[in-house]
Design a protein with these regions (language model features):
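Nucleotide/phosphate-binding catalytic cleft detector across ATP-hydrolyzing
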Residues: 1-155, 161-271, 276-277
Length: 279
């Protein structure tokens, strides 16, 4: 494995690890469970995610990355150690790593990412803004002299960028993403149906029937939770329109941020490239 390059996505929702020549070798929820008494790591990734809302007082389930930045360096280090061991048995093995980070984070936050990754046996760490990584992953040719807009909806952050000639011309981010949409659905279910649901149920509903605008053919989904009035198990059938209504205010915030980034792209800049802006 010596000399192998890797790419890491330290997402608020998922941890992804790409190894050159092998492809994506890890794609799991970026969650870790810790025993409070012994400070021992109990589970990482999918196993830890399944413990959300089901653990005892002793076990704490934590997301080491929130809002696109590392919120717990110790647990992020434990997560990195866990996954890097999956691809090698040596602590000193990979000279280079590329790590995707939100475009709007501070220099201090960028340094924290570099330090966390470098502490796990990687000699050289390069950071790449999320919109650039997303564009390359989507197969966009960002070397061409026209603008391409990329919107990356993460769990904690929506990252927006306009790319041209191998650089990020204009960017912006907003702390609204999948986690906020889930919370919107949780609040909506409680407010409208007196139904208490958890994060995993909200996530499933969002993925199944969530929409930013009304669908031509309305879809339905069954929410299962607990009746707030009597504490008994309950279920309610909701439509895609209702889930869209629940998320509407947050979706509008993202749209407004996209508009502000577009407005920051000067007409002169576009004319200089003799082309139009492609979304």
């Amino acid at each position: 494995m010596a000399g192998t390059d890797i790419a890491i996505d330290l997402g608020s929702a998922n941890f992804r690890l790409y190894v050159d020549g092998k492809g994506v070798v890890v794609d799991e929820p970026n969650v870790i469970a810790v025993d409070e008494d012994s400070n021992r790591v109990v589970a990482v990734g999918r196993r830890a995610y399944k413990m959300l809302g089901r653990t005892s007082d002793r076990v704490r389930v934590v997301k080491p990355v929130t809002g696109g930045v590392i919120s717990d360096l110790t647990l992020m280090d434990a997560t990195l150690q866990h996954y890097l061991k999956k691809v090698t048995n040596s602590r000193v093995f990979m000279p280079r790593a590329v790590v995707a980070v939100p475009s709007g984070i501070t220099e201090v936050e960028r340094r924290a990412v570099v330090d966390a990754v470098a502490a796990n046996g990687i000699r050289k760490v390069c950071l790449i803004e999320t919109p650039v990584a997303a564009a390359i992953g989507a197969g966009l040719d960002i070397s061409r002299p026209h603008g391409s807009m990329v919107v990356k909806l993460g769990e904690g952050v929506s990252d927006i960028g306009v790319l041209s000639m191998n650089r990020l011309s204009v960017s912006g981010s907003i702390a609204v993403g999948g986690a906020v949409f889930n919370e919107d659905i949780i609040k909506y279910a409680r407010r409208k149906f007196d139904l208490i649901i958890g994060e995993q149920t909200a996530e499933a509903a969002k993925c199944a029937v969530g929409c930013a605008f009304p669908l031509k053919d309305i879809e339905k989904y069954e929410l299962r939770g607990r009746d707030e009035r009597n504490g008994l198990p309950a279920k309610v059938e909701v439509t895609s329109d209702e889930i869209g209504e629940a998320m509407l205010e947050s979706v509008v915030k993202v749209v407004h941020k996209i508009q502000s980034v577009l407005e920051a792209v000067s007409y002169t800049h576009l004319r200089a490239h003799e082309t139009s802006l492609h979304l």
